[in-house]
Design a protein with these regions (language model features):
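Alpha-helical interaction/linker modules in multidomain eukaryotic proteins
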Residues: 1-142
């Protein structure tokens, strides 16, 4: 998995998002990251959102944690969170990073995540569009 500092443009998916796709939680064992506590309520909500996450792109396989010897099946989804004219994108491994490595994501991410009830609703898709997420919906077309 590629490393991106939090809230920097993420070009992992290989399309032009004009700087509106910002990375959160794309960690690497060679880079420092913020640590702290996440509430159980926020962790459960993020877990639920990732469980049912809208996936506009096909995964090329699972990514493993390079911070530890984690060997579980994980890392093949991403969560897209619309916020203030941008889309914040976090890998599924963010749950592992929070739980096992005490990763603390930016406040902007948790605030935006709390506003999302589900990624399976039309309201969510409208929020993506309202925050420059057209590239996500175009990527989902066959």
């Amino acid at each position: 998995m590629s490393y991106y500092p939090d809230l920097t443009p993420c070009d992992y998916f290989g399309f032009d998002h004009q700087g509106h796709l910002l990375a959160v939680g794309w960690l690497d064992g060679t880079q420092e990251y913020s640590s702290g506590s996440v509430t159980e309520e926020d962790y459960r909500h993020l877990s639920m959102l990732i469980e049912t996450a809208f996936q506009p792109f096909h995964s090329m396989g699972a990514h493993q944690c390079n911070l530890c010897q984690f060997d579980g099946v994980s890392g093949n989804k991403n969560i897209f969170i619309p916020d203030k004219g941008d889309i914040l994108v976090a890998p599924e491994l963010i749950l592992h990073y929070i739980n096992q490595h005490h990763y603390l994501h930016p406040k902007r991410f948790i605030t935006a995540m709390r506003r999302i009830e589900s990624t399976t609703t039309m309201d969510y898709k409208k929020q993506l569009l309202a925050n420059h997420g057209q590239f996500l919906l175009k990527g989902n077309q066959s």
